[in-house]
Structures are given as structure tokens and as C-alpha cells.
Amino acid sequence: MTHDYIVKALAFDGEIRAYAALTTETVQEAQTRHYTWPTASAAMGRTMTATAMMGAMLKGDQKLTVTVDGQGPIGRIIADANAKGEVRAYVDHPQTHFPLNEQGKLDVRRAVGTNGSIMVVKDVGMKDYFSGASPIVSGELGEDFTYYYATSEQTPSSVGLGVLVNPDNTIKAAGGFIIQVMPGAKDETISKLEKAISEMTPVSKLIEQGLTPEGLLNEILGEDHVQILEKMPVQFECNCSHEKFLNAIKGLGEAEIQNMIKEDHGAEAVCHFCGNKYKYTEEELNVLLESLA
């Protein structure tokens, strides 16, 4: 059980909807599993944090997958989450790292690239899917998710994401916020929000200082205005299994399975999301072949 969690809140009498997350241990779990280097850890961690909060907006068994592909050296960042605070992620090239940028920060933009898109696919149940995409406008990811909400979901939002990495590659702090303007919000409220966000300390610094998700929202929106609705735990969770990969092998067809038996005397599958390995004996593959006959 991690100490990570997300809070859902309203502010300014329901004119603003807000989410904030602490994801340090969740991102650490992903870093450990994928051996990511610092710049890759920051890019993956920011994406995981955003995806976890987007998952918190879902209901029941709904889930979503986010693919960030800016055509940069890191390749794709793929994360998925559900409404229960479970999130997982991987990157194509985990050993991606660059010198710090001019601001002295991890150069996430250089790793992610700026010539691609963010794609979001929501599985809302009953074989019903919603998908949206928007171009990457910054590569720093916070601005890119902000732009995604404005263009794909027509929801004016501000997304702040931060990950700090220790010299030994472990995660020092990770978290973020999504603040959304609801239909009918007063201009005065929007102006206050814009001013507060433009003047705030970077989110990773606030988390490093020990600010909780509640504290983050109080810092941005003002303690008097925030009404916390719910607090839910967040953790790295992968739903892969021996059986799921066996089904995937089944989908490869008879010829491919016969080849595995003849040449490899079995099979091994590795989960992209968590790195777990699953081994399949000749005997298991023969049983699988018989079921296809």
C-alpha cells in the first residue's frame, strides 16, 4: 500500500473542479521496474501523474490509455489508469537522459519531442470508446495536457506536473494537479485562477517542500475556496497474467506456436508495462495447439 493519493475537489462554489495528486511512490515503482534514467523518469512520471488524475474522473470499471508520442528520442510514453487509482506506464526507450536544460531542470521537452501528439482512448464500458487527440505544443507535458483538454474535450483547464529525481536515479518527489473551469464560471473567478497559476511556485518544488495534494490546491485556489470531495489511494498496478499472455500466444495462430515448440521448446512473454516474465512449457503450448485444432 503506498502513501500516494489523489484528492477531488470543488472550488468557488462549484465553478472550478480540481484534482491533485501525490505520486512519488507510484512513479518510483515504475522507475524500478523499467530502470529509467532521470529524463525518462521525469517524462514517464509526469505522464503517469496526469493519467492517474484522468482516471480519477472516470466511474466504475471505466479505464483509459494515454499515448504520448512527440517523435523524440524517448519514443512513445504509454500509460493507462482506471477509476480505482491504479496506474501503470512504460516508455519505448527507458535509458534516455540529457544534460539539464537552461533552467537547470530535466530536459523533458528534448526527450519527448515536439512533433507529435497526445492520444487518449477511454473505455467507457459496453464496448464503447471515446478517443481524442491533440498536437504536442511544448513537450514539457503539463502544457500539452492543458492543450489536450482545451481542444479535445473543450474544457478550459490548467495541468501542472512535476517529477524530481535524486542523483542515484530514485524519485525524490512526483505529483501534479488538474484544475478545470466549469460551464457558467464567472469571469472574475477565471481571472483569479489565471493570476494564481501564473504566480505559483513550480509544482515539483511544492511537492519537494512536503505539500500534500490538499496543500497544492489550497496554494493555488486559496484555502477558503476549496471543498475536498474525495480522497483516493493511487498505486502502480498491472493486470497482466499468465493466462492473458497465453491467450495472446493463442492469437498468433498454429504455425507460429508450432515454431515456438520446434525451435524454442517453449515460450517466454514479457509484459511491457511491468516487466513481469511468463514462461510457457512445450506441454502448455501443445495443449494450446490442440484447443485450436
From Swiss-Prot:
Coiled coil: none annotated. Signal peptide: none annotated. One of its GO terms (molecular function) is protein folding chaperone. It is found in: Cytoplasm. Belongs to the HSP33 family. It holds the Pfam family HSP33. Disulfide bonds join 238-240, 271-274. It comes from the Bacteria. GO terms for biological process: protein refolding. This is 33 kDa chaperonin. Under oxidizing conditions two disulfide bonds are formed involving the reactive cysteines. Under reducing conditions zinc is bound to the reactive cysteines and the protein is inactive. The keyword Iron does not apply. PANTHER family: 33 KDA CHAPERONIN. One of its GO terms (cellular component) is cytoplasm. Redox regulated molecular chaperone. Protects both thermally unfolding and oxidatively damaged proteins from irreversible aggregation. Plays an important role in the bacterial defense system toward oxidative stress. Keywords: Chaperone, Cytoplasm, Disulfide bond, Redox-active center, Stress response, Zinc. Gene3D superfamilies: Hsp33 domain, HSP33 redox switch-like.
